[in-house]
Amino acid sequence: MPSLSKEAALVHEALVARGLETPLRPPVNELDNETRKRLIAGHMTEIMQLLNLDLSDDSLMETPQRIAKMYVDEIFSGLDYANFPKITVIENKMNVDEMVTVRDITLTSTCEHHFVTIDGKATVAYIPKDTVIGLSKINRIVQFFAQRPQVQERLTQQILTALQTLLGTNNVAVSIDAVHYCVKARGVRDATSATTTTSLGGLFKSSQNTRQEFLRAVRHHN
């Protein structure tokens, strides 16, 4: 793996140790992003031609390049730990020992089974120990792991593990409520169902009162 920030390396190692890392094959020859985009565009051209689409049409001729750029620079950018957000943690000088909750974190991800959209919101909470984290960093961590081919259960646990690792405490909880377009737009075509996943650590798992306080925050969001 290329040179990474200390925080990115720690999070990656923690996910591997827990068996929660996104399935990735070892790179045989590390490609730069421009090469990736060029090769993806070539394969996308072949796919579109197999669908009998006319790539000489001005509406379609740039589509392979647009998709390649979207994959590498946007919706799958979380596969590259070089894009892991810069994390700021500060000493807990105020001795905060109550739950800190961030609700309504918007996320858009991609189902790894069909490569269609997952659209949802996350609620994240933690009880500080020695450090506290800049609130926007929680949103950025959620977004980083969402920018991958995902299953919602793994995404929830990846966010939990990342925050536990960075904050040095197990007292973290994550809940995600999302609509899966592999259910909404194909297959059963259920336009109204949503999926909720929750991952609890430390006191959020062992203390009924703490768990209920978090779940009330989740219900408030819903």
Curated annotation (Swiss-Prot):
It catalyses: GTP + H2O = 7,8-dihydroneopterin 3'-triphosphate + formate + H(+). Zn(2+) binds at residues 111, 114, 182. One of its GO terms (cellular component) is cytoplasm. Gene3D superfamilies: 1.10.286.10, 3.30.1130.10. SUPFAM superfamilies: Tetrahydrobiopterin biosynthesis enzymes-like (SSF55620). Toroid-shaped homodecamer, composed of two pentamers of five dimers. This is GTP cyclohydrolase 1. It comes from Enterobacter sp. (strain 638). The gene is folE.
